[in-house]
Amino acid sequence: MTDPDCREFRVRWADLDPNGHLRHTAYMDYAAQARVALLHDYGFTLERFQELRLGPVLFREETRYLHEVRANERVSVTTELSGLSANGKHWRMRHCIFKADGTLACVVDVQGAWLDLRTRRIATPPAELVQAMEQAPRTRDFAEFGARKPV
């Protein structure tokens, strides 16, 4: 089993809410940035997605807040594939956000697919993208699911 991909961030003033802790949507922003960075590392840059006329689209995003994160703290965001359809169209990813001391602060689970940017329909990705997704670190509970959108 491969270690999760990990990205580090420092909480900015703009990431805070009026209570002085990390704004709820900032967790999702960090998760999205970590996801995009992982794809970039596999060669799927924004420019490459534009060439393919393909992009990721989310259907569901579930966030579980466990511990408070405050201003100027450093956090680490892990990314793992938690599910992939047999044809590669649909996928699930899990992001865990850890405080600098290793405390799990938040878990973000997302479910998405690949969108054909011309037809605006869900599309089977090219083989090179399916291969990249298959190489991504996986959660312990990773599951392959059928070609239809997972529930």
What are these regions (language model features)?
Residues 3-7, 40, 69-74, 82-151:
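HotDog/MaoC-like acyl-thioester-processing domains
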Residues 1-41, 150-151:
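Catalytic strand-loop segment that frames the active site of acyl-thioester-processing enzymes
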Residues 47-56:
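Short, basic/aromatic beta-hairpin or loop at an interaction surface
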Residues 18-21, 67-68, 73:
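Short histidine-centered beta-strand/loop micro-motifs
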Residues 20, 79, 120:
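Hydrophobic pocket/interface hotspot
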Residues 22, 56-58, 105:
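A broad, structural micro-motif
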Residues 59-66, 78, 92:
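Short structured motifs
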Residues 9-13, 65, 114:
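Hydrophobic residues in beta-strands and at strand termini
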